[in-house]
Amino acid sequence: MSRYRGPRVKIIRRLGVLPGLTNKIPQLKSSSINQSTSNKKISQYRIRLEEKQKLRFHYGITERQLLNYVRIARKAKGSTGEVLLQLLEMRLDNIIFRLGMAPTIPGARQLVNHRHIGVNDCIVNIPSYRCKPQDFITIKNQQKSEAIISKNIEFYQKFKRPNHLTYSSLEKKGLVNRILDRESTGLKINELLVVEYYSRQA
């Protein structure tokens, strides 16, 4: 299944707030619609499916990519769900987004694809590149690159940056301090339901 490129508002109306996909807030449904929905019995499969879809759309990855991340997480030590979130959060496109260098993950991916971003002073054009603790995220030394990212950083100042990341406005450089903890994930998600969804595939 390919990466979703359709209307983003349609997705957040169904799944709720997904800051990685869009910074728009879904409009609340009318009380009559909510009442009719609450009277319907929602299957466990649908609940797991929707949690899985939240991860896919928030991080902007394909079905195959998510399945591969689940398989890697299963082989790692620790909680499979927590490791899965760490793998997704340490993607370069997500790090750029969480640093505030881009308004969304698709926007961050575009910066990477257009070679605006460096890791440890080397240009990286792979959005799925897995960052590590003590990695420096830098802006390509071009006026256009700096103007785009500085504008995003200025807008992001009103939001709280997660503790595992720091950004120096003076040096125009981000730093991955450590692997994030569960509470720092910027998404309301039950990752265990995602693991259960893939239990027969991974």
Swiss-Prot record:
Assembly and interaction partners: Part of the 30S ribosomal subunit. Contacts protein S5. The interaction surface between S4 and S5 is involved in control of translational fidelity.
Annotated InterPro entries: Ribosomal_uS4, Ribosomal_uS4_bac-type, Ribosomal_uS4_CS, Ribosomal_uS4_N, S4_RNA-bd, S4_RNA-bd_sf
UniProt record, GO biological process: ribosomal small subunit biogenesis; translation
Molecular function GO labels: rRNA binding; structural constituent of ribosome
GO cellular component entries: chloroplast; small ribosomal subunit
Pfam families, alphabetized: Ribosomal_S4, S4
Intracellular or extracellular location(s): Plastid, Chloroplast
Organism, as annotated: Hookeria lucens
S4 RNA-binding domain sequence ranges: 90-153
Function: One of the primary rRNA binding proteins, it binds directly to 16S rRNA where it nucleates assembly of the body of the 30S subunit. With S5 and S12 plays an important role in translational accuracy.
CDD domains, alphabetized: S4 (cd00165)
Gene3D superfamilies registered for this protein in UniProt: Ribosomal Protein S4 Delta 41, Chain A, domain 1, RNA-binding S4 domain
Family: Belongs to the universal ribosomal protein uS4 family.
The name this protein goes by in its record: Small ribosomal subunit protein uS4c
Entry keyword set: Chloroplast, Plastid, Ribonucleoprotein, Ribosomal protein, RNA-binding, rRNA-binding
Transmembrane segments: none
Tagged with keyword Cell division: no
Parts forming coiled coils: none
SUPFAM superfamilies: Alpha-L RNA-binding motif
